[in-house]
């Protein structure tokens, strides 16, 4: 597919609806989400949609940064960024936990929180930017937009002299080599049910 260049833009809550739609499509086939939100049980799509909605709404409500890629004003890629001093706030919010319990159920919320805590436990000491959600819309994958999104993200995070880097994770083996080509080094592995989540 041809390489396309997208406009890089810092996003605010006005992009919440587009962000939720994009991230839902990016994560609905993710093996980690399939385990966390029980893809074998009816209602899986609704649980993924609800989780993405709650994460995105809380992210923008706390005025945390997000970088987007736009082509002809359509959001095609996004990275939600949790700066070093704020990265734990979302899952520690009781209102967020309550909304998750009501929309995804106790077992899925518990699984998600355990996964989140296990990933954060892999972080080395020091301040890092963490990416709770990152994705390129499936219709636009294979066009080097993932590379463009990560470059924009790295440039933005580099402006914070107090940060030692960016941390992300994936349980999708398809993305392992991609992240390594972008210069990421694996710092840990987390067992998420039958899935091995790689932390970079």
How would you label these PLM feature ranges?
Residues 147, 159-163, 171-189:
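Conserved active-site alpha-helix within GNAT-family acetyltransferase domains
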Residues 41-65:
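Active-site rim helix/loop that mediates acceptor-substrate recognition in acyltransferases
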